[in-house]
Amino acid sequence: MKRMIAALALVLTLALPGLAAAEGTGMYLAPKFLMSIQDTGRMERSSGLAGSGVDDYSQFTLGGALALGYDFWPQQMLPLRAEIEFALRGNSEHSWSDGGTNVSDVKGTWNNSTLFANLFWDFHNDTPFTPYIGAGLGLAFNYTGYDFTTTNGSKFSVDDRFTNFAWNVGVGASYSFNENLAIDASYRFVGLGYNEVSAYHNGQKYEVGNDPYNNEFMLGLRFAF
């Protein structure tokens, strides 16, 4: 993640002078800083995890996104923007030690990245501030993993990766410094599909399913070119 952010900063530093001098074509590049509250959503457990305490969990994580977009306002005077966005987020982790019937400790690790096609409606006015609403459809690339410790001390793990349909809806506002540069702040809700992993240990089935989602706050820039 640190390498990605450093590389992105270098690219933007090199590209900024050219972007600032470019004429408005409607195209823009938008790096975004993500503050994400990742939630496991509803947790479904098999009987092997009875009493383990495994339940809904949420955690604040950081991430980053990069979007390439087109603003229909400069050329067509339509208050629409469309963009393709890829976002990465940090891991969410939690441990339960409630001493269940079969397991004494469970550690969960979750992660998601997304690829969205987003559409925004801008409410243009006579000020540099432009409120907007938006929604997007795309794919979520989810990771789910669990480490189990049984009541007799043995350990085993299960994990998997999922590619799910994902969606988002949100609101935000931008402030334009000039025709080529704007700062953007927004909130969105992100649905990430359904994940389910299972394993057998000593003849007992251990299965966990969940519907993850994120509440995300984003701060970004838009470089028009």
Language-model regions: role of each:
Residues T25, A30-K32, Y57-S58, L62-D71, ...:
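Outer-membrane beta-barrel transmembrane strands
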Residues Y28, L34, P212-F225:
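Outer-membrane beta-barrel "beta-signal"
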Residues M1-G26:
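Cleavable N-terminal export/targeting peptides
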Residues Q75-L80, T127-F129, Y175-I183:
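Repeated loop/turn-to-beta-strand initiation elements of outer-membrane beta-barrel proteins
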Residues M35, Y70-F72, W121-F123, F141, ...:
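Residue-level signature of outer-membrane beta-barrel architecture
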Residues P31-M35, A82-L88, I133-L139, A173, ...:
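Transmembrane beta-barrel strands of outer-membrane/channel proteins
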Residues L66-L68, A82, A117-L119, I133, ...:
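Membrane-embedded beta-strands of outer-membrane beta-barrel proteins
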Residues Q38-L62, L88-T114, L139-N164, L192-F217:
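Extracellular/periplasm-exposed beta-strand and loop segments of Gram-negative cell-envelope proteins
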